[in-house]
Swiss-Prot record:
Superkingdom classification of source: Bacteria
Keywords of this entry: Cytoplasm, DNA-binding, Transcription, Transcription regulation
The protein, known as: Probable transcriptional regulatory protein CLD_1467
Family according to the record: Belongs to the TACO1 family.
Record lineage: Bacteria, Bacillati, Bacillota, Clostridia, Eubacteriales
Originating species: Clostridium botulinum (strain Okra / Type B1)
PANTHER family: TRANSCRIPTIONAL REGULATORY PROTEIN YEBC-RELATED, TRANSLATIONAL ACTIVATOR OF CYTOCHROME C OXIDASE 1
């Protein structure tokens, strides 16, 4: 199929913080709290909660941790009110960057995000300065395994409403519209498939190739952002050098 997901290129460069399983669970737990407060604690009637639970399971979040987050949000346990904010700006060499934040203190978050940008030669911009370069898409990543037929999986995904299907080195990447993400994900789940990733994210229309010096600076920026408890997601359009390692 047309297009390139760049999943491995970006996934491999997500930063040291993403290797900290507890931090990932904390961030997803905050997403669960927001989803429940917006649509209620029942996944059957709350599509956003279903999506976040799928993301949690793809990250191997224990069921009891998921349930605790749901109870927390539904008032059975003390829950914090979070504000959702997206910051936009430019990394080194003009890399377009979006930063999603869930915070109980937007002044703290704004200061921390601005510091991460400026420390590595980037700058925070105004709303809309780079978001037009991205589209909201569903992305489902499935590990290649013996017995999993590529053609069958592709037809299964496309029949369920997927927009695109990519075969990469070790994974298959299914792309969907934001609207059809839940339908496609549930159809694949019904076939017994497990996901390495299943979430709606901002995907760049085009990627910008960067050299090793820029990659080193930008990775430091990503590490600072992803180590911030308020930062939920960081999206960018950088294409790291082939074989580049931090």
């Amino acid at each position: 199929m047309s297009g390139h997901s760049k999943w491995h290129n970006i996934q491999a460069k997500k930063g040291k913080a993403d290797a900290k399983r507890g931090k990932i669970f904390t961030k997803i737990g905050k997403e669960i709290v927001v989803a429940v407060k917006q649509g209620g604690p029942s996944a059957d009637s709350n599509p956003r909660l279903r999506d976040v639970i799928a993301k949690a399971k793809a990250n191997n979040m224990p069921n009891d941790t998921i349930e605790r987050s749901i109870k927390k949000a539904s008032g059975e346990l003390n829950a914090v009110d979070y504000e959702t904010i997206t910051y936009e700006g430019y990394g080194p060499a003009g890399i377009a960057v979006l930063v999603d934040v869930l915070t109980d203190n937007k002044n703290r978050s704004a200061g921390n995000v601005r510091y991460a940008f400026t420390k590595q030669g980037g700058n925070m911009g105004s709303t809309g300065c780079v978001s037009f370069m991205f589209q909201s898409k569903g992305q489902i990543v499935i590990e290649k395994k013996d017995g999993l037929d590529e053609d069958e999986l592709m037809m299964m995904a496309l029949d369920a409403g997927a927009e695109d299907f990519e075969s990469e080195d070790e994974v298959y990447v299914v792309a969907t519209s934001q609207e059809d993400f839940g339908t496609v994900r549930e159809a694949l789940e019904a076939e017994g498939l497990e996901f390495l990733e299943a979430e709606i994210k901002m995907v760049p229309d085009t990627y910008t190739a960067i050299d090793e010096d820029t990659a080193t600076k930008f990775q430091k920026m990503l590490d600072v952002l992803e180590d911030d408890d308020d930062v939920q997601n960081v999206y960018h359009n950088a294409e790291f050098p082939e074989g580049w390692e931090e």
